[in-house]
Amino acid sequence: MAAYTATSAVGVGLGPLREALAARRSGLRRNDFGDGERLDTFIGRVAGVEESALPASLAGWDCRNNRLAWMALQADGFLDRVAAARKRHGERGVAVVVGTSTSSIGASEEAYTRLDGDGGFPADLARPIVHTPHSLGDFVQQALGLRGPAVTVATACSSSAKVFAQAARLIRSGVVEAAVVGGVDTLCGSVLFGFNALELVSSEPCRPFDVARRGLSLGEAAGFALLEREGSGPRLLGWGESSDAHHMSSPHPEGLGARLAMEGALSRAGLTPADIDYINLHGTATPKNDEIEADAIAGLFPASTWASSTKGWTGHTLGAAGIIESVIALLALEHGEVPGTLNSAELDPLCGPQLRLDNGQRRCRHVMNNSFGFGGNNASLLFGYA
C-alpha cells in the first residue's frame, strides 16, 4: 500500500481520523441534510462539501459526490503519490477501480426537481456524465491524469471493498503495474428516505452490537489507496468474496456468505483465524446484520482476536464503507491503535469474546475488514506486512 487517505464526518485526512478514534469523538450529528422534510435521525455528514469547488478543468464533472472525492484526493499528499506512480508506470500503467452505491444520484434528483419548460434537465445539470453510475470512476481517472483501465464497482455496501480484489487481479495478471482504489458515497434523498422505507434507520446515534440497537446511522465519506506490484508498507495479503443470493436486503440467516468471504480471505493469504489480530466488522447496528455477523465471528475466530464496528464514528457510509474501514484497519496495523465500538454500552449476548467496546493498544500483524452489502454481496480483506 503505497499510500492511503480517508475523509469522513470526523474530518479530512488521516490526522483527524486518528484523533477522533483515539478521543472516541463521533462525527454523527442530528440530521440537517436537504431542504423541506427531514428524517428524525443522526447522520455522518462531511463539513465543507457545499463550499468546495472543482478545478475549472474538471467543472464538467461537478456534483456533490465528485466534490467530496476531490476533497479526499487532495489530503495526505495522495495526489503527489499518484503522480509519482504515474511517472514510474506511465499513464496507462495505473488503473482506477472505485466503488459507489449511488454515484451522483443526488445531482439527478436535483435535476428532476428543476426541469425546464420542455421537461428537460436545467442547463447547469445537462451534463450526461454526472447522471451515470460511472460518474465517479470517470472523474477520478480524469482528475489523476490516468489512461489505464477505469472500473466503477456498484455492489451496494461492499463496493469499495471489492475494488481491492479487482485491482489485485489486474496487477497480478500483468494488465497494470499499479491501481488507485477507493470509494465515495454522499448523502441524498434516495439514500435517507430509501433506507427509512426499509425501517432500518435509527432515530438515535447507531449502537452496533448493542442489545438495544435500533438501526443504522447513515453517513458519507471518500477514501483512496494506491496499490503497487512492488513497494514498501502494508500489503493486501488476501481477499474473499461471496454472494448469498438469499434476499434483497437481508443476509443469509446462518451467515453462510459472511463466513465464506472470511474463509476465502484467510485461505488466499495462507493464514488461520488465530493469525488475525483485529477485525473491523461491518456492524451496521441493524438487528439481523449484527446478529448474524457476531455469530459468524464467534464461530470462526478464537477469543484472542479483537473485533469492533467503527460506524459509531462515521455512520454507515454505504459504498464508501469498504475503503473507510479498510483505512481504519490499516491504521491499527501501522500504529497499534485498535478502536472499540462507539455508543454501545451492553453487548448482545450473541456476541462472542472477540467483540470489544473499549479502544486498546496491541501490536497487530494481520488485520481484516468485512463489508457486506444488499443482495448478499460480501467481501473480506486481509492486510499485513509481506
Protein language model features and the residues they cover:
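Conserved small-residue
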Residues: 3, 21, 96, 140, ...
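Active-site-proximal gating segment of KS-fold condensing enzymes and close homologs
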Residues: 100-151, 289-302
